[in-house]
Every structure is written in structure tokens, then in C-alpha cells.
């Protein structure tokens, strides 16, 4: 009320038959207090008047007193009277609580008890009260529970607050407001459990304003009302509601949260505020600085209480509660009330009245939200998301939830160009988060991609669609996510992408769907019937990418190439083809240890740290038409040089091959070359037929013996001093048909009639070209060969 404005006139309260005539109930137009007026004597008072003694019913007759005789009877009567004044015996828990806190009747309330409006007092036992509770699924557990307030006018709120309520467009209280308001006005502890978007914020703010008006504390001595919230977004949202509905009543408020400078927050505290909305972490920091006093707090609210306790704020909350006097009123407003949290909450509340909207023990989703659960693979998520976004009306607000901050940023960048999206998560600074939320509220950025940091308590109007791109890590978070739409009586739509890795939540998700009368997909029911296992039968011998391993799942989660498919990329491609890698000739090439050891020089250049070699390799790949042939020829020449360097190793390999008759491991594909018949007359070291590679002693099939002295052709090879720098690393197509062993024999027995290209044609030389200038990078093994003279 501004200065110079006449105070509002009082108004009559609803008729109360229990009032003696001619008393009438009045409501103060300025403060909203209920008081009583006698029009005959013009006397007003806050205490409810009692009827005259002549109108009181006669008391019941007392039983005749027992006969008394002697001193012992008088002592016995004295003990009986003292016992009758002693309160009933209670358990140790009640005694411990009363030692720290006084009873509800002796809390920090004003000297005159503020009664409920007469309409609520007389309707507590009215049949319409039970009908109202049954219609709105209200369950109340506690003592002396008043009837719900069905209209704002009967709540006893001052005209300033009523004007703000009417300006906000509220026609009647929500069920949680209607039942929790009269309980809170009686200075009782409250546990209010209701679905998201049910108006819990005003459920504790308006009684808190009435509490402030009754006490008339000095704001400079500290706040009177303290509200704790788990996240910065929820805290700022509560502050906005407190400022909007408390401005006309001259109620000052401030918000304390991390991620913002402390200077402005400390200045607000120094000026004095009535209401403090804070996160536990920042409030503890300011308490350690001794810049705030909570000795005057008598109205404590824990919004999203289960969330704060689940997030690990229990030590901070207990530390804050120790700074608050025990004579206080505590209220917990939340959407869920798990059994694990009830034990902790018993230490913070005294004889609370529990008000539940809907089911008591199970999670309940808003029935006004249409839930669509789609079983989908990770690689199909982005394409389906784009289809949903294109089907929405232009300018519709869509909220998308992801589980990781990295995915949140990447998905926002992908959608920004087409739809205009922004991201919000815990790594964003407070200014960035406020800017993103401002753009989302105004419609400048109609799509918001968020993590669970924005899932609890975020109240943004006109959110049409909520999309769970990644299923949350708990079914409680799912209820809070979809609760961002369908608020304040509106309807909404929720889409949920459900993958095989989320199968452990299938049974709980079905309960949520059935509780809200939503359709349950058949695939989801089948998954739940299998005990939460995946929906597809997995092949034991499938590759990792086929089984949906970690790499393929990660790549598909981030959209794959171009953000559309879940291609696993180069790493997964090599893994998936490791066991089944087929060449052009149809034979299987095992990419095991042997292949990695015999990688050609071009492959080694590929992993070279030198940018120059990498560029050369990229140019050679564009000019080479037969990379596999170049690799085969280079592999065999390298094997022959490694055998020829060590005479001891050569003799050792010869003895091993002669004694055992077993084939040496091929440096190439590791396969044995078998011939249809064996001829022991052939000499192993001097082959006349290059197609025969049998062992001379036992006639068993063996490998080509590469342990020999270098030939003149080898001495003039690429590592010899006479090398002219122009050579190739591939063999002719005709020699390649018989495999790598034949290529080795061609290099061992060259054709005299062939041109001096070391057994290769010009076509082969062009195909195996490595560099534009024909140079080959130095190799330490080549230098060792040159120093040894090229032969042993």
C-alpha cells in the first residue's frame, strides 16, 4: 500500500453459528487478519468470544466423592491430582524432540493466535469436504486437519495479495494449495506431495507472507522466511514469484545461489530482507562469512526436498538447521517422497501433516501429458528427433533432455541451423544460463536442449513438447522431466527414446504409463516380461559394432557422420573386419599380429609423425592403383633381407625346417601353399620349377626357404649403394596370382630377357610408385644393411 492511500475497509467474514449473538466476524482489509466485533458495544477483539454463562449447557453431574479418613487419604488425593496434571507418557523420540524444540503451541507465533477463517472451521466435518478430497484425490494424514479452502476469498489473504492473484489469472486454488494453506496457517509442519506443475510454490509462499505480517520482525536483524532449493534455476524462479506476489505487501526478498557474484547478494542482506531463497551451498558460504543471521527464521521451507537429499545436500541442510531456532515451522514441498528420504525428514519435522495428491507410495505422472515411448536404436535418434521437430507448429517451445553435457552441446549445434536451439547445463556460467532461459521464454530460441539440471522445478510457460533424447538414470527424473509440460491445467506431449541399454527401467516405466492411463507399447511390455533384458537376440560371434558395443554406441549417440547415422568410423571398421577380412581373390586375410608386423612402408608412413611423409603418402595413394601388390612385394623383400643379415639365424631356420618338416610362418597371409603331389628328388635350395615348394627330405609340403645369400639383383636393390633411387615396390599382376611366395621366387630367379627393372614391368613400376620424385624415406634397417655390405 503506497503512502497517502486510504486503508482498505474491513469486510464481513462468513457466518459462524458458534459465535454468540450479536458478535460478527470481520477480516481486516489491510492485513487480512480475522477479528470479532460486537455491534452493540462496539468492541473488537482477536480472541473468539465465548457465549454467556447462562447460555452454556449445564455440566454433567459429578460422581460423589469417596469417603476420606486420615492423613493417608489426603496424600493419596494429592498424588492423584498431580498425576492428572501430568501429560501422558511418551516414547524416547518425543522426549528427545521436545528437548530441542518446544511444543507446537509454544512456537514463535504472535501473542494472539491467528485462527482459521470461519468457513474452513465449520466445514471440517462437512460431507462436501470429503467429496472435494475424493474428487481431487487428496489424502491427508495427521491430527486436527482443517478443511480445504476452495476459494481465494475465504483464505483470509489481504486485498493486495488477492489483487496479485487475480492479475495472475488464477480462478481457484489448486488441490495442493487448497489443502495445505489452512494447515500452514495453523502453524503446523506440512509435507506436501503433489505432481509437478500443481502450484506448490504459492502453496508455501502465501502462508509465509501471512506469517511475516503477523510477526512484524525487523528485516535488518535477519530474514523471517527461509526457502531452500536444490538448483539455481529453481531458486531464481521462486524469487520471481515472491517478488511478484509480495511487492504490494512491502515484503522484500533476495536470492542466494552459486555461480554469481556475492557482492549484490551481500548488499541485499545488509539492507534487510524478509524472505531469503537460497541454495544450500551458497548459504553455507555466507554463514561462514558471518554476513547473515538465521536466529529470526521461524518459517523454513524445503522445496524439492527429496532432490536436495538425493543430491547429497544433507550435511549442508543439517548445518543450516542448527543455525535456526528450534521454535520454527517446517514445510516440505516435493513431487516424490521416497522411503529412503522419510527417515531423514523425521529429524527435521515435528508431528507433520502429510498431504498427498494422487498415489501415496508410487510415482505419479500428470495425466494431462500424452506420453509417447518409442523403442529405437541410438543411430536413429537424430533422424526421428528432426521428424518430431518438423511436425510441430512454428514457434512452439520444445524442451529436449540429454544425459551428458557433451551431448547437450553437440545436439544444440546440430539443431541450431535448422530450428534455432540453445543448450543449458552445469558448465554454463550463471549469465549464460540466464541468457539462454530468457531467449527460450521469449521465443527467440524455441528449442532448449538441457541436462537434468533444468529438469527439477523449472517453470516455463507454454512448453508444448518435452523430448527425452536420452532416457534418464532414474524413473523419478523421468517424471520430473515430462512434468515441464502440461502445467497449470494445460496439456502437453512427451516423447521418450527408449533403447536396449535402458531396459532395466522398462517395468517402472510401464507402471508410470499405466498410472496415467497411457498406451504401453508392445515392445516395451515384451522387454519388461523378459526381466529387463534387451529386445534383440545378440549373436555370439557378431562383431563389436554389430553387437552395439561401446564404440558403436558412443558414435551413434553423437549422431555419427553428418549427425545422421551411427557409423562407427575407422576404429570400429577395423575392429569389425578383423576376423572376416576377405580380399579380391576370395581368400581370408587374417589381420592379426603377423599382418601388423609386415605392414608396408606406405602404412608406416601413414602413422609417421612427419607432416611431409603424411603428405607424400596422400599423394601416392591417389596415383597408386594396386596398393596390395606393392605391400606384398615389399613384405617379401624385407623378409629376405632379414633372413640374409644373420648367418646363424639362417642356419638355425634351415635346421628347423629340415628336422621338423614344418612350414615356416609366412610373413604375409600365414597360409601354406600345397601342391597335388610331392617329388623328393627336387632340391629345396635350387628350384627348377618355381611352382614347387616342397621339402626335399621328407616330401612334406613346406614354405619357400628365404634363408639364402643375396643375389646380385638383391645387392642392387633399393638399400644397396648402387641403388639409383628409382624403384618400385609392387610386382606384376602375373606374378601376384601365385601369392607372396611366388613373388619371392621371382625376385630370386629373375628372367634374363626382362628389362632391368628387377623383375617388374613399367606398368608395375607406375602402379607401385610411392613419391612423385621416386624417393623412399630412410629406414634404420636399410642403413644397417648398407654398413654390412649387403651380404653376410
UniProtKB/Swiss-Prot annotation:
Disulfide bonds: none annotated. Residues 17-51 form the WW domain. SUPFAM superfamilies: P-loop containing nucleoside triphosphate hydrolases, WW domain. Residues 181-355 form the Helicase ATP-binding domain. ATP-dependent RNA helicase involved nonsense-mediated mRNA decay and ribosome biogenesis through rRNA processing. Belongs to the DEAD box helicase family. DDX5/DBP2 subfamily. This is DEAD-box ATP-dependent RNA helicase 40. It comes from Oryza sativa subsp. japonica.
Amino acid at each position: 500500500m503506497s503512502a497517502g492511500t486510504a486503508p482498505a475497509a474491513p469486510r464481513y467474514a462468513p457466518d459462524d453459528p458458534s459465535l454468540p449473538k450479536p458478535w460478527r466476524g470481520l477480516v481486516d482489509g489491510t492485513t487480512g487478519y480475522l477479528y470479532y466485533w460486537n455491534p452493540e458495544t462496539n468492541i473488537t477483539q482477536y480472541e473468539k468470544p465465548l457465549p454467556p454463562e447462562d447460555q452454556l449447557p449445564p455440566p454433567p453431574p459429578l460422581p460423589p466423592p469417596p469417603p476420606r479418613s486420615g492423613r493417608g487419604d489426603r496424600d493419596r488425593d494429592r498424588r492423584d491430582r498431580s498425576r492428572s496434571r501430568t501429560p501422558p507418557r511418551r516414547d524416547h523420540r518425543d522426549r528427545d524432540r521436545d528437548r530441542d524444540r518446544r511444543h507446537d503451541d509454544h512456537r514463535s507465533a504472535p501473542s494472539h493466535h491467528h485462527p482459521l477463517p470461519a468457513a474452513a472451521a465449520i466445514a471440517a466435518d462437512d460431507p462436501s469436504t470429503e467429496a472435494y478430497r475424493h474428487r481431487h484425490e487428496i489424502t491427508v494424514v495427521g491430527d486436527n486437519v482443517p478443511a480445504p479452502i476452495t476459494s481465494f476469498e475465504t483464505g483470509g489473504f489481504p486485498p493486495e495479495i488477492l489483487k496479485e492473484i487475480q492479475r495472475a489469472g488464477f480462478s481457484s486454488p489448486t488441490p495442493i494449495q487448497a489443502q495445505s494453506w489452512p494447515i500452514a496457517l495453523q502453524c503446523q509442519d506440512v509435507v506436501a506431495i503433489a505432481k509437478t506443475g500443481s502450484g506448490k510454490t504459492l502453496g508455501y509462499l502465501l502462508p509465509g507472507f501471512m506469517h511475516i505480517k503477523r510477526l512484524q520482525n525487523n528485516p535488518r536483524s535477519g530474514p523471517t522466511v527461509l526457502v531452500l532449493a536444490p538448483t539455481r534455476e529453481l531458486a531464481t524462479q521462486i524469487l520471481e514469484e515472491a517478488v511478484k506476489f509480495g511487492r504490494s505487501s512491502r515484503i522484500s526478498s533476495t536470492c542466494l545461489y552459486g555461480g554469481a557474484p556475492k557482492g549484490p547478494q551481500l548488499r541485499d542482506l545488509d539492507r534487510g530482507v524478509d524472505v531469503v531463497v537460497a541454495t544450500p551451498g551458497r548459504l553455507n558460504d555466507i554463514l561462514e562469512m558471518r554476513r547473515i543471521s538465521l536466529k529470526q527464521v521461524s518459517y523454513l521451507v524445503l522445496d524439492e526436498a527429496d532432490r536436495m537429499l538425493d543430491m547429497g545436500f544433507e550435511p549442508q541442510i543439517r548445518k543450516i538447521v542448527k543455525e535456526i531456532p528450534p521454535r520454527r515451522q517446517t514445510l516440505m514441498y516435493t513431487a516424490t517422497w521416497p522411503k529412503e528420504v522419510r527417515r531423514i525428514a523425521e529429524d527435521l519435522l515435528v508431528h507433520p501433516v502429510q498431504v498427498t495428491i494422487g498415489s501415496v507410495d508410487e510415482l505419479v505422472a500428470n495425466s494431462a501429458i500424452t506420453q509417447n515411448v518409442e523403442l529405437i536404436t541410438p543411430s536413429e535418434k537424430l533422424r526421428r528427433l528432426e521428424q518430431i521437430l518438423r511436425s510441430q507448429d512454428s514457434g512452439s517451445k520444445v524442451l529436449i533432455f540429454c544425459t551428458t553435457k557433451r551431448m547437450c552441446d553437440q545436439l544444440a549445434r546440430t539443431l541450431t541451423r535448422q530450428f534455432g536451439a540453445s543448450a543449458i547445463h552445469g558448465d554454463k556460467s550463471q549469465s549464460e544460463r540466464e541468457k539462454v532461459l530468457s531467449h527460450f521464454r521469449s521465443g527467440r530460441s524455441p528449442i532448449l536442449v538441457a541436462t537434468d539440471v533444468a529438469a527439477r522445478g523449472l517453470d516455463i510457460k507454454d512448453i508444448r513438447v518435452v523430448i527425452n533424447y536420452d532416457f534418464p538414470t532414474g524413473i523419478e527424473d523421468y517424471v520430473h522431466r515430462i512434468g515441464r509440460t502440461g502445467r497449470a491445467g494445460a496439456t502437453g506431449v512427451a516423447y521418450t527414446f527408449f533403447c536396449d541399454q535402458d531396459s532395466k527401467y522398462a517395468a517402472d516405466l510401464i507402471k508410470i504409463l499405466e498410472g496415467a492411463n497411457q498406451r504401453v507399447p508392445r515392445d516395451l511390455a515384451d522387454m519388461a516380461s523378459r526381466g529387463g533384458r534387451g529386445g534383440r537376440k545378440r549373436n555370439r560371434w557378431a562383431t563389436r559394432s554389430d553387437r552395439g558395443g561401446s564404440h558403436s554406441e558412443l558414435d551413434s549417440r553423437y549422431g555419427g557422420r553428418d549427425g545422421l547415422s551411427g557409423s562407427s568410423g575407422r576404429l570400429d571398421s577395423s575392429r569389425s573386419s578383423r576376423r572376416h577380412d576377405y580380399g579380391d581373390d576370395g581368400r581370408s586375410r587374417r589381420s592379426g599380429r603377423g599382418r601388423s608386423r609386415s605392414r608396408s612402408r606406405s602404412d608406416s608412413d601413414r602413422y609417421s609423425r612427419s607432416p611431409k611423409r603424411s603428405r607424400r603418402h596422400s599423394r601416392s595413394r591417389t596415383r597408386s592403383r594396386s596398393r596390395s601388390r606393392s605391400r606384398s612385394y615389399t613384405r617379401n623383400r624385407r623378409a629376405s633381407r632379414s633372413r640374409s643379415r644373420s648367418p646363424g639365424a639362417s642356419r638355425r631356420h634351415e635346421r628347423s625346417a629340415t628336422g621338423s618338416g614344418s612350414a615356416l610362418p609366412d610373413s604375409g597371409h600365414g597360409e601354406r601353399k600345397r601342391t597335388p603331389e610331392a617329388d623328393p628328388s627336387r632340391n629345396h635350395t635350387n628350384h627348377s620349377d618355381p611352382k614347387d615348394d616342397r621339402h626335399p627330405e621328407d616330401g612334406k609340403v613346406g614354405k619357400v626357404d628365404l634363408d639364402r645369400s643375396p643375389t646380385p639383383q638383391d645387392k642392387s636393390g633399393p638399400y644397396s649403394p648402387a641403388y639409383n633411387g628409382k624403384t618400385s615396390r609392387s610386382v606384376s599382376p602375373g606374378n601376384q596370382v601365385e601369392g607372396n611366395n611366388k613373388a619371392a621366387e621371382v625376385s630370386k630367379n629373375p628372367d634374363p630377357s626382362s628389362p632391368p627393372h628387377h623383375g617388374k614391368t613399367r606398368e608395375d613400376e607406375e602402379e607401385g610408385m610411392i613419391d612423385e620424385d621416386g624417393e623412399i624415406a630412410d629406414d634404420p634397417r636399410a642403413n644397417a644393411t648398407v654398413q654390412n655390405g649387403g651380404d653376410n
